[in-house]
C-alpha cells in the first residue's frame, strides 16, 4: 500500500443522548454524538406508536362526504 494516501482509521466513541456509549472504529477522527441508539429507539424498545393517519383517499372522502350519510 502507498504511504500517506489512506485516511487515519482510529477508535471513536459514539455517545447517545440516553447515556449509552458505543466504541467503534471510523475515519471521522473525533467522537460522535447520537440522538437515538438501539437502547432508546422506540422500534427496538417496544414503545412504538401506531399512527393511523390514512392516505389521500381517506382525506378526500372525509373532505367531500355528505354529513349524516355513511
Curated annotation (Swiss-Prot):
The keyword rRNA-binding applies. One of its GO terms (biological process) is translation. InterPro entries: Ribosomal_bL28/bL31-like_sf, Ribosomal_bL31, Ribosomal_bL31_A, Ribosomal_bL31_sf. Binds 1 zinc ion per subunit. GO terms for cellular component: ribonucleoprotein complex; ribosome. Part of the 50S ribosomal subunit. This is Large ribosomal subunit protein bL31. It comes from Erwinia tasmaniensis (strain DSM 17950 / CFBP 7177 / CIP 109463 / NCPPB 4357 / Et1/99). The gene is rpmE.
Amino acid at each position: 500500500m502507498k504511504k500517506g494516501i489512506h485516511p487515519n482509521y482510529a477508535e471513536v466513541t459514539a455517545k447517545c443522548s440516553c447515556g449509552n456509549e458505543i466504541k467503534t472504529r471510523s475515519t471521522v477522527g473525533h467522537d460522535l454524538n447520537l440522538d437515538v441508539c438501539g437502547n432508546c429507539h422506540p422500534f427496538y424498545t417496544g414503545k412504538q406508536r401506531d399512527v393511523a393517519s390514512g392516505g389521500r383517499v381517506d382525506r378526500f372522502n372525509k373532505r367531500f362526504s355528505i354529513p349524516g350519510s355513511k
